[in-house]
Protein backbone atom coordinates (compact mmCIF):
# COMPACT_ATOMS: atom_id res chain seq x y z
CA UNK A 1 0.00 0.00 0.00
CA UNK A 2 1.09 3.56 -0.80
CA UNK A 3 0.04 5.53 2.28
CA UNK A 4 0.56 8.90 3.94
CA UNK A 5 3.05 8.52 6.78
CA UNK A 6 0.51 9.94 9.19
CA UNK A 7 -3.19 10.83 9.19
CA UNK A 8 -5.45 12.58 11.66
CA UNK A 9 -8.46 10.30 11.52
CA UNK A 10 -11.89 11.79 12.14
CA UNK A 11 -14.72 9.25 11.99
CA UNK A 12 -17.10 11.96 10.80
CA UNK A 13 -14.80 12.47 7.79
CA UNK A 14 -13.63 8.99 6.71
CA UNK A 15 -12.03 10.41 3.56
CA UNK A 16 -9.29 11.74 5.85
CA UNK A 17 -7.97 8.19 6.28
CA UNK A 18 -6.16 8.58 2.96
CA UNK A 19 -4.05 11.13 1.07
CA UNK A 20 -3.26 11.09 -2.64
CA UNK A 21 0.38 10.11 -3.01
CA UNK A 22 0.28 8.99 -6.66
CA UNK A 23 -1.85 8.92 -9.83
CA UNK A 24 -5.54 9.32 -9.06
CA UNK A 25 -6.30 7.53 -12.35
CA UNK A 26 -4.34 4.52 -11.16
CA UNK A 27 -6.13 4.62 -7.81
CA UNK A 28 -9.57 4.58 -9.43
CA UNK A 29 -8.55 1.70 -11.71
CA UNK A 30 -7.49 -0.32 -8.66
CA UNK A 31 -10.93 0.15 -7.13
CA UNK A 32 -13.28 -0.40 -10.09
CA UNK A 33 -11.66 -2.96 -12.38
CA UNK A 34 -11.94 -6.76 -11.91
CA UNK A 35 -9.18 -8.47 -9.90
CA UNK A 36 -7.34 -11.60 -11.02
CA UNK A 37 -6.89 -14.33 -8.40
CA UNK A 38 -6.39 -18.08 -8.27
CA UNK A 39 -8.59 -20.24 -6.04
CA UNK A 40 -8.14 -24.00 -5.69
CA UNK A 41 -5.99 -24.00 -8.83
CA UNK A 42 -8.49 -22.08 -10.96
CA UNK A 43 -7.73 -18.60 -12.30
CA UNK A 44 -10.72 -16.29 -12.01
CA UNK A 45 -11.83 -12.70 -11.52
CA UNK A 46 -13.32 -11.28 -8.31
CA UNK A 47 -14.89 -7.94 -7.52
CA UNK A 48 -12.59 -5.14 -6.38
CA UNK A 49 -12.85 -4.19 -2.69
CA UNK A 50 -14.16 -7.66 -1.75
CA UNK A 51 -12.36 -9.92 0.75
CA UNK A 52 -11.85 -7.19 3.36
CA UNK A 53 -9.52 -8.26 6.19
CA UNK A 54 -7.80 -6.59 9.13
CA UNK A 55 -4.00 -6.79 9.26
CA UNK A 56 -1.71 -5.79 12.15
CA UNK A 57 1.92 -5.18 11.21
CA UNK A 58 4.47 -4.21 13.86
CA UNK A 59 1.66 -2.91 16.07
CA UNK A 60 -0.05 -0.79 13.40
CA UNK A 61 -3.53 -1.77 12.22
CA UNK A 62 -4.36 -1.76 8.52
CA UNK A 63 -7.14 -3.15 6.38
CA UNK A 64 -6.75 -4.89 3.04
CA UNK A 65 -9.09 -5.75 0.16
CA UNK A 66 -8.82 -7.07 -3.39
CA UNK A 67 -7.61 -4.44 -5.85
CA UNK A 68 -6.92 -4.66 -9.56
CA UNK A 69 -3.60 -4.88 -11.36
CA UNK A 70 -1.04 -5.48 -8.64
CA UNK A 71 -0.99 -9.25 -9.01
CA UNK A 72 0.83 -8.88 -12.34
CA UNK A 73 1.76 -12.23 -13.86
CA UNK A 74 1.78 -14.28 -10.62
CA UNK A 75 -1.39 -16.22 -11.47
CA UNK A 76 0.20 -17.27 -14.76
CA UNK A 77 3.73 -17.87 -13.49
CA UNK A 78 3.18 -19.73 -10.19
CA UNK A 79 1.61 -22.81 -11.71
CA UNK A 80 2.22 -25.01 -8.65
CA UNK A 81 0.54 -22.61 -6.19
CA UNK A 82 -3.21 -23.32 -5.86
CA UNK A 83 -4.27 -20.06 -4.19
CA UNK A 84 -2.94 -16.60 -5.02
CA UNK A 85 -4.43 -13.20 -4.40
CA UNK A 86 -3.32 -9.59 -4.17
CA UNK A 87 -4.69 -6.97 -1.80
CA UNK A 88 -3.85 -3.34 -1.08
CA UNK A 89 -3.20 -2.09 2.46
CA UNK A 90 -5.01 0.99 3.74
CA UNK A 91 -5.70 2.56 7.13
CA UNK A 92 -8.91 1.33 8.82
CA UNK A 93 -12.14 2.84 7.51
CA UNK A 94 -10.85 3.67 4.05
CA UNK A 95 -12.56 0.91 2.12
CA UNK A 96 -15.96 1.58 3.72
CA UNK A 97 -15.72 5.14 2.46
CA UNK A 98 -14.55 4.08 -1.01
CA UNK A 99 -17.44 1.62 -1.32
CA UNK A 100 -19.87 4.43 -0.53
CA UNK A 101 -18.32 6.61 -3.24
CA UNK A 102 -18.45 3.85 -5.86
CA UNK A 103 -22.05 3.07 -4.90
CA UNK A 104 -22.87 6.75 -5.42
CA UNK A 105 -21.10 6.95 -8.80
CA UNK A 106 -22.18 3.46 -9.96
CA UNK A 107 -18.50 2.78 -10.66
CA UNK A 108 -18.20 5.55 -13.25
CA UNK A 109 -14.50 6.33 -13.70
CA UNK A 110 -14.67 10.12 -14.14
CA UNK A 111 -17.24 10.66 -11.39
CA UNK A 112 -15.23 8.57 -8.93
CA UNK A 113 -12.03 10.37 -9.91
CA UNK A 114 -13.59 13.80 -9.39
CA UNK A 115 -14.79 12.88 -5.89
CA UNK A 116 -11.35 11.55 -4.95
CA UNK A 117 -9.70 14.75 -6.20
CA UNK A 118 -12.07 16.85 -4.08
CA UNK A 119 -11.96 14.71 -0.95
CA UNK A 120 -8.42 13.31 -0.67
CA UNK A 121 -5.65 15.81 0.18
CA UNK A 122 -2.34 15.36 -1.65
CA UNK A 123 0.95 14.72 0.15
CA UNK A 124 4.58 13.96 -0.65
CA UNK A 125 5.22 12.52 2.81
CA UNK A 126 4.43 8.90 2.01
CA UNK A 127 5.47 5.37 2.87
CA UNK A 128 5.14 2.14 0.88
CA UNK A 129 4.05 -0.74 3.12
CA UNK A 130 4.75 -4.20 1.69
CA UNK A 131 3.50 -7.44 3.22
CA UNK A 132 3.67 -10.88 1.62
CA UNK A 133 2.29 -13.97 3.33
CA UNK A 134 2.72 -17.60 2.20
CA UNK A 135 1.09 -20.66 3.72
CA UNK A 136 1.98 -24.24 2.88
CA UNK A 137 3.31 -27.53 4.25
CA UNK A 138 6.82 -28.79 4.88
CA UNK A 139 8.24 -32.13 3.71
CA UNK A 140 6.56 -33.87 6.65
CA UNK A 141 3.16 -32.39 5.87
CA UNK A 142 3.10 -29.93 8.77
CA UNK A 143 1.75 -26.41 8.13
CA UNK A 144 4.35 -23.69 7.56
CA UNK A 145 3.95 -19.93 7.27
CA UNK A 146 6.51 -17.52 5.81
CA UNK A 147 6.01 -13.77 5.61
CA UNK A 148 7.82 -10.62 4.51
CA UNK A 149 7.09 -7.12 5.78
CA UNK A 150 8.85 -3.84 5.14
CA UNK A 151 8.36 -0.12 4.67
CA UNK A 152 9.98 1.86 1.86
CA UNK A 153 10.59 5.61 1.85
CA UNK A 154 11.56 8.19 -0.75
CA UNK A 155 15.16 9.15 -1.54
CA UNK A 156 16.89 12.18 -3.12
CA UNK A 157 13.78 14.34 -3.14
CA UNK A 158 11.57 11.58 -4.57
CA UNK A 159 8.51 10.26 -2.76
CA UNK A 160 8.27 6.64 -1.69
CA UNK A 161 5.94 5.76 -4.55
CA UNK A 162 8.20 7.53 -7.05
CA UNK A 163 11.30 5.74 -5.78
CA UNK A 164 9.81 2.25 -5.74
CA UNK A 165 7.99 2.65 -9.06
CA UNK A 166 10.89 4.15 -10.99
CA UNK A 167 13.52 2.07 -9.21
CA UNK A 168 12.58 -1.17 -10.95
CA UNK A 169 12.68 0.52 -14.36
CA UNK A 170 16.11 2.00 -13.66
CA UNK A 171 17.33 -1.40 -12.44
CA UNK A 172 16.17 -3.01 -15.70
CA UNK A 173 18.06 -0.40 -17.73
CA UNK A 174 21.14 -1.07 -15.62
CA UNK A 175 20.87 -4.81 -16.37
CA UNK A 176 20.40 -4.12 -20.08
CA UNK A 177 23.53 -1.95 -20.16
CA UNK A 178 25.42 -4.75 -18.38
CA UNK A 179 24.19 -7.24 -21.01
CA UNK A 180 22.27 -9.36 -18.50
CA UNK A 181 18.92 -8.82 -20.23
CA UNK A 182 18.14 -8.09 -23.87
CA UNK A 183 15.14 -6.75 -25.73
CA UNK A 184 11.65 -6.62 -24.25
CA UNK A 185 11.52 -8.57 -21.00
CA UNK A 186 8.93 -9.31 -18.35
CA UNK A 187 10.31 -8.12 -15.00
CA UNK A 188 9.19 -11.38 -13.38
CA UNK A 189 11.60 -13.37 -15.58
CA UNK A 190 14.69 -11.51 -14.34
CA UNK A 191 16.87 -13.17 -11.71
CA UNK A 192 16.11 -11.80 -8.23
CA UNK A 193 19.82 -11.96 -7.42
CA UNK A 194 20.65 -9.83 -10.47
CA UNK A 195 17.89 -7.34 -9.67
CA UNK A 196 18.85 -6.86 -6.01
CA UNK A 197 22.53 -6.51 -6.96
CA UNK A 198 21.87 -3.38 -9.04
CA UNK A 199 22.85 0.07 -7.86
CA UNK A 200 19.25 1.18 -8.52
CA UNK A 201 17.91 -1.37 -6.03
CA UNK A 202 20.37 -0.32 -3.35
CA UNK A 203 19.61 3.36 -3.91
CA UNK A 204 15.86 3.52 -4.49
CA UNK A 205 14.52 0.80 -2.21
CA UNK A 206 15.28 2.55 1.06
CA UNK A 207 13.75 1.01 4.17
CA UNK A 208 14.64 3.70 6.73
CA UNK A 209 13.71 7.37 6.97
Predicted regions and their residues:
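C-terminal catalytic/substrate-binding lobe primarily of soluble NAD(P)-dependent oxidoreductases
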Residues: 1-209
